């Protein structure tokens, strides 16, 4: 058997009709096929192909593997056929042909791989077995149909081929000699080539030479089949004179892989006729079968399907069957549930429970099995259902459907199921009327429930309902008020965090529209008025010191100026934004001088004294200084001055003084033991301005 390289197989696949026009084959390195249909155009490169199908010919299409597979299939088919029909093939002819072929070795066509040819549609054409006497025909002439007998024409196939083979002198060259040879071969090997239409398979076989002249090597062997024509496709069948009486048509074709292959066109008309006849016979058999009528449960009879009746053994000789007898036998074979039912009822009576009034067969569509998702059940698997007998009877539509299907024939199952599905879908008008009734029923039920709920309300629930309604109205009014406020702020652009920060920045900036002071904002004025109100508290209370809330630097300066005019001490503590001012009384403080007139006078004076001084080059923040027309003596400090020298005596209402008096202290007495009494004067703090000395 000759072997083919990958490149040779690629050359054959490229021009074969197996692949479509859009299929391209990528060659291996070393391929020198100059007849490539793709050319050297850059657009035909692999990278430019829209859709590429790469095929490795050795893996995809291997003629050697296919030939081995065909040989194995043929051997298995022959063995099975011989075992079934017990037909012994004549061994002499086979051995003789094999010996002849092995001795001569002149037919070199046997070394070439034979394979199934493939049409342009991708369908494989089956190969027909070639009769042994086919080689005896004249290869240069077409055999007439009338020259063959009728039986040989029906069993065998007319072979037409035109090969450019040079016939030898001893070959048969006339149709008369070929007819005689056909008759001889038909009588000797009639059993070998007779086939049934059902068991016929298309097989591949190498023709055996029966001609004595060729077998004895007396004549010159024919030239090798490789010199035959390249290909004869099935499209050229009309060129041959073919009689319509033949059952099958085969033609010899040539391919580049092998020298000879046989294409066969199967005629499936006989198979279709056989299928139709088989269906008709089945229908007639079903009509002849007895139709068993269904019995109602109310009459005490049993229903059973046709499948159950077919499983019974009937006497073939008797035409009429005793159905009553058969049904009684069938029922007698099944287990009775009477004892189980009595036991269950007795247990329920002992436990004083409701009686179970009925036992139903649990089919595949029962409620419990559907709930538990159980599959198929056994034949005698039952489930107990408990329901009130005063209600309507229990009719499960799913079980009714299964009974109908079981009672019907096999062919009518699908029709009944379709009929049930159609019945479920009501007409459009009926569906609308049903929905309308459902809506009315739902409204009526809701109205009855509402009336029952309203009648059951007592005084307490009514009071609770009134309270809840009142609270709901309050919440609603509160939300409406907040909504109005938010709408107002939104219209002014003051809603949100960004708007609030913007408003604060604008309030801190100096406003030219302020008639009182160009540098004081509304918040600053409110703070100063608050300071004035706190200072008036010194009139009516014994408070010596007060602390003011933290404020900005220039506001603290204004507070210090105000305290100086009122003869008060002022001092700031803390750092940063938390720096605040402390005010304390002096002996010069006159409470009567603190009035609205003095405050307005101070505010008018401060209006012209507050100025901003900025240092742009140094990058400092703006600094505000307050300049006064006159300076008070209270603000000046002298060297050697006693701190609090002019301070008034602590009043008797002071809680500290009252505590000391309870302990035995009085004015002019020193602190300490009477025998070792301390200084009678209070401790003093002397101011030192100069830096000389330690004291």
From Swiss-Prot:
Compartments it resides in: Cytoplasm
Main location: cytoplasm
A Pfam family annotated for this UniProt entry: G-patch
Alphabetized PROSITE patterns for the sequence: G_PATCH, R3H
Keywords: Cytoplasm
Domain of life of the organism encoding this protein: Eukaryota
GO MF assignments: nucleic acid binding
Region (Disordered): 168-200, 213-242, 257-317, 332-351, 388-448, 475-517
Protein name, UniProt field: G-patch and R3H domain-containing protein C30B4.02c
């Amino acid at each position: 058997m000759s072997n083919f390289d990958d490149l040779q197989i690629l050359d054959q696949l490229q021009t074969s009709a197996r692949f479509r026009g859009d299929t391209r084959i990528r060659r291996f390195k070393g391929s020198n096929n100059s007849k490539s249909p793709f050319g050297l155009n850059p657009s035909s490169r692999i990278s430019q192909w829209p859709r590429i199908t790469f095929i490795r010919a050795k893996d995809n299409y291997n003629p050697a593997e296919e030939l081995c597979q065909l040989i194995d299939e043929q051997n298995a088919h022959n063995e099975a056929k011989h075992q079934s029909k017990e037909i012994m093939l004549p061994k002499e002819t086979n051995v003789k042909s094999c010996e002849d072929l092995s001795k001569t070795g002149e037919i070199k066509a046997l070394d070439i791989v034979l394979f199934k040819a493939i049409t342009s549609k991708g369908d494989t054409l089956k190969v027909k077995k070639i009769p042994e006497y086919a080689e005896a025909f004249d290869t240069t002439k077409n055999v007439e149909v009338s020259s063959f007998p009728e039986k040989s024409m029906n069993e065998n196939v007319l072979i037409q081929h035109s090969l450019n083979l040079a016939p030898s002198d001893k070959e048969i060259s006339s149709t008369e000699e070929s007819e005689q040879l056909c008759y001889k071969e038909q009588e000797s090997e009639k059993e070998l080539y007779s086939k049934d239409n059902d068991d016929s398979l298309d097989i591949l076989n190498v023709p055996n030479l029966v001609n004595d002249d060729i077998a004895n090597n007396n004549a010159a062997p024919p030239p090798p089949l490789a010199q035959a024509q390249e290909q004869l496709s099935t499209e050229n069948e009309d060129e041959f004179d073919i009689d319509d009486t033949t059952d099958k048509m085969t033609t010899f074709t040539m391919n580049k892989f092998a020298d000879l292959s046989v294409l066969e066109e199967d005629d499936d008309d006989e198979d279709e006729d056989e299928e139709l006849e088989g269906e008709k016979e089945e229908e007639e058999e079903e009509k002849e079968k007895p139709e068993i009528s269904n019995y109602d449960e109310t009459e005490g009879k049993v229903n059973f399907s046709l499948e159950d009746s077919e499983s019974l053994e009937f006497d073939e000789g008797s035409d009429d069957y005793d159905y009553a007898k058969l049904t009684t036998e069938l029922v007698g074979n099944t287990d009775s549930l009477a004892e189980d039912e009595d036991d269950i009822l007795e247990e329920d009576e002992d436990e004083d429970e409701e009686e179970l009034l009925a036992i139903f067969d649990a089919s595949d569509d029962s409620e419990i099995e559907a709930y538990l998702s159980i599959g198929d059940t056994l034949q005698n698997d039952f489930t107990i259902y408990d329901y009130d007998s005063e209600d309507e009877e229990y009719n499960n539509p799913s079980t009714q459907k299964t009974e109908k299907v079981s009672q019907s024939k096999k062919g009518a199952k699908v029709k009944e199921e379709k009929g049930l599905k159609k019945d479920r879908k009501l007409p459009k008008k009926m569906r609308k009327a049903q929905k309308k009734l459902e809506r009315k029923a739902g409204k009526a039920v809701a109205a009855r429930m509402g009336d029952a709920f309203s009648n059951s309300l007592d005084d307490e629930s009514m009071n609770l309902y009134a309270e809840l309604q009142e609270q709901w109205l309050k919440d609603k009014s509160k939300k409406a008020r907040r909504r109005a406020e938010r709408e107002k702020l939104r219209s002014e652009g003051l809603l949100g965090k960004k708007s609030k920060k913007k408003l604060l920045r604008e309030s801190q900036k100096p406003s030219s529209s302020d008639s009182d002071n160009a540098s004081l904002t509304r918040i600053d004025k409110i703070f100063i008025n608050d300071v004035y109100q706190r200072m008036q508290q010194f009139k009516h209370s014994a408070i010596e010191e007060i602390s003011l809330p933290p404020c900005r630097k220039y506001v603290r300066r204004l507070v210090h100026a105000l305290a100086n005019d009122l003869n008060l001490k002022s001092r700031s503590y803390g750092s940063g934004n938390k720096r605040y001012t402390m005010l304390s009384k002096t002996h010069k403080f006159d409470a009567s001088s603190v009035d609205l007139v003095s405050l307005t006078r101070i505010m008018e004076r401060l209006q012209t004294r507050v100025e901003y001084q900025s240092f742009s080059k140094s990058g400092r923040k703006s600094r505000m200084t307050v300049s006064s027309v006159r300076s008070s003596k209270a603000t000046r400090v002298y060297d050697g001055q006693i701190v609090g020298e002019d301070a008034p005596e602590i009043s008797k209402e002071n809680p500290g003084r009252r505590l000391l008096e309870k302990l035995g202290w009085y004015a002019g007495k020193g602190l300490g033991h009477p025998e070792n009494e301390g200084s009678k004067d209070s401790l003093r703090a002397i101011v030192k301005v100069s830096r000389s000395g330690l004291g």
